[in-house]
């Protein structure tokens, strides 16, 4: 009788442990698959997440989501005009931050790179053309000023 009771306890404990182990394994597998997709999207655009890129360029994520939706629809002219104004504001912020952080103006190449990668990430999200680097006016050298 005692053997039967011990046997039932061992079998029941093994079943509970096996079920818990398989559920934990399934959860770990789905979490790993989800992290791979988010990491691949981030690595495609310089390692920046979209929310981080929006923070760098001071862009409202909801406005960006509206632009993406309108670019996908493209049926109302007034909505497209609103989207273009948001894109123009983003371009203006990018140009300003990129120029301010240029090495010629005692800026930081690191910050300039962050600004560039943020804009690259946003343009990638909007599926726009690749981003050209803006022209920066270089300061005149002392030799040119003497002539």
From Swiss-Prot:
One of its GO terms (biological process) is protein import into mitochondrial matrix. The keyword ATP-binding does not apply. The keyword Lyase does not apply. Keywords: Membrane, Mitochondrion, Mitochondrion inner membrane, Protein transport, Translocation, Transport. Residues 128-147 are annotated as: Disordered. Residues 52-127 are annotated as: J-like. GO terms for molecular function: protein domain specific binding. It is found in: Mitochondrion inner membrane. It is a peripheral membrane protein. It comes from the Eukaryota. GO terms for cellular component: PAM complex, Tim23 associated import motor; TIM23 mitochondrial import inner membrane translocase complex. Belongs to the TIM16/PAM16 family. Heterodimer with PAM18. Component of the PAM complex, at least composed of mtHsp70, MGE1, TIM44, PAM16, PAM17 and PAM18. The J-like region, although related to the J domain does not stimulate ATPase activity of mtHSP70. It nevertheless mediates the heterodimerization with the J domain of PAM18 and is therefore essential for PAM complex function. Essential component of the PAM complex, a complex required for the translocation of transit peptide-containing proteins from the inner membrane into the mitochondrial matrix in an ATP-dependent manner. In the complex, it is required to regulate activity of mtHSP70 (SSC1) via its interaction with PAM18/TIM14. May act by positioning PAM18/TIM14 in juxtaposition to mtHSP70 at the translocon to maximize ATPase stimulation. This is Mitochondrial import inner membrane translocase subunit TIM16. It comes from Yarrowia lipolytica (strain CLIB 122 / E 150).
